[in-house]
C-alpha cells in the first residue's frame, strides 16, 4: 500500500491537494477525479485502494520521509485498476473454458460471474474455435506471461485455473513465494500494467480482443449511446434536461476511458497542434494558465486536448 501511495504522491502535480490523491486511490466516482487521474497518468491507480481510510492516508503522508521504497509501481495511462483486473479475469475465464472444453467438460462453474466478462470471453472463445486458433491462443498466452516475467517477477500464473487444476489463493501464493500479501498485491499490480501494455503492442491478435475498458457511469453511458446515434451535445443536454457542462463531463469520461477518440470533432487540428506544442513544454500547470495562453479555446476543449495527450492518442507532429 505504501508504495502505491508514494507513487501517487510523486506523480501528482504540485498544486493538487492530498484529498485529490486520496480520491483517485479510493476511486471516487466524480468527473474531476477521472480527469485528475488521466491528466497525471495515474489512471491505473484509480480505485486501487478502495478500503483506504483518510486518517490512515494522512498518517502515511506525515511519516513519508521515513518510508524507504523498495520497488517501483508501474503506471498505465489508459486503464483503471478495475479494467486491468477485469481483463485478467477474462483471461482466467478463457483459459478455464479452453481447458475444460478440450476435456469435453461443459458443466464447469465459471471462474467469473461478471456478465460483461462472460460475454466477451464467449465471443473470443467462438472466434478461436471457428478459426481453429487453439495453437495460436496457447502461443500468445505463453508469450504474454514470458513478457510479464521479463519486466519483473510474475505471479499472475498462480491464478490460472484449468481442467482439474484449481487456482491458488493469494494467501497460498504469499506463503509459497515468502512475500506478504501486501507485497504480492503490489507485484501483481505491476504484472497487470505490463499485461495491458503487452496486449496493446500489436503482438496478440487473439488476447487483445479480451481487453475490458473501464466502466462508464450510468448517465455517461446514456450520453455515449446518443453520441453513437449522431445526436449533438446540445441535443443530448436537452433530452436529459441538464446543462451542456454535464454533457461535456460525460464526453471527457468517454474519451478518458477509451470508448471514443474523435478529438477532431471537438478541436480543430491547427488548434490542437498549437496547444500541444505549448503543453508538452508546460505540463502540470493549472487550467487557468492554459486558458490565459489560449483564450479562444474553452476549458472543455483544453481538457479534451490534455486527455488526448496524456492517453497517448494525440501527439505533436
List the model feature ranges, each with a label.
Residues 1-317:
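Long, charge-rich, low-complexity intrinsically disordered regions
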Amino acid at each position: 500500500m505504501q508504495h502505491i501511495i508514494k507513487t501517487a504522491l510523486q506523480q501528482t502535480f504540485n498544486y493538487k491537494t492530498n484529498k485529490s490523491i486520496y480520491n483517485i486511490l479510493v476511486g471516487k466516482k466524480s468527473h474531476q477525479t477521472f480527469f485528475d487521474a488521466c491528466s497525471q497518468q495515474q489512471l491505473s491507480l484509480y480505485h486501487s485502494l478502495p478500503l483506504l481510510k483518510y486518517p490512515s492516508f494522512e498518517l502515511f503522508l506525515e511519516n513519508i520521509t521515513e518510508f524507504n521504497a523498495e520497488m517501483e509501481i508501474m503506471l498505465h495511462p489508459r486503464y483503471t485498476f478495475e479494467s486491468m483486473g477485469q481483463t485478467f479475469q477474462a483471461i482466467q475465464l478463457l483459459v478455464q473454458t479452453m481447458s475444460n472444453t478440450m476435456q469435453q467438460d461443459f458443466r464447469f462453474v465459471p471462474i467469473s460471474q461478471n456478465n460483461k466478462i462472460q460475454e466477451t470471453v464467449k465471443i473470443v472463445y467462438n472466434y478461436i474455435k471457428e478459426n481453429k486458433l487453439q495453437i495460436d491462443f496457447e502461443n500468445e498466452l505463453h508469450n504474454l506471461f514470458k513478457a510479464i516475467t521479463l519486466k519483473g517477477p510474475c505471479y499472475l500464473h498462480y491464478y490460472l485455473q484449468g481442467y482439474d487444476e484449481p487456482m491458488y489463493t493469494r494467501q497460498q501464493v504469499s506463503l509459497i513465494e515468502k512475500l506478504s500479501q501486501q507485497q504480492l498485491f503490489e507485484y501483481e499490480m505491476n504484472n497487470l500494467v505490463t499485461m495491458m501494455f503487452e496486449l496493446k503492442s500489436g503482438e496478440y491478435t487473439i488476447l487483445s480482443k479480451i481487453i475490458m475498458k473501464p466502466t462508464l457511469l450510468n448517465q455517461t453511458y446514456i450520453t455515449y449511446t446518443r453520441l453513437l446515434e449522431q445526436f449533438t451535445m446540445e441535443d443530448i443536454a436537452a433530452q436529459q434536461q441538464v446543462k451542456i457542462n454535464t454533457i461535456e463531463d460525460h464526453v471527457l469520461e468517454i474519451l478518458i476511458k477509451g470508448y471514443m477518440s474523435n478529438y477532431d470533432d471537438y478541436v480543430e487540428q491547427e488548434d490542437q497542434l498549437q496547444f500541444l506544442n505549448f503543453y508538452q513544454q508546460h505540463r502540470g500547470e493549472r487550467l487557468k494558465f492554459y486558458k490565459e495562453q489560449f483564450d479562444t479555446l474553452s476549458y472543455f476543449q483544453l481538457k479534451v486536448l490534455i486527455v488526448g495527450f496524456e492517453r497517448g492518442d494525440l501527439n505533436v507532429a
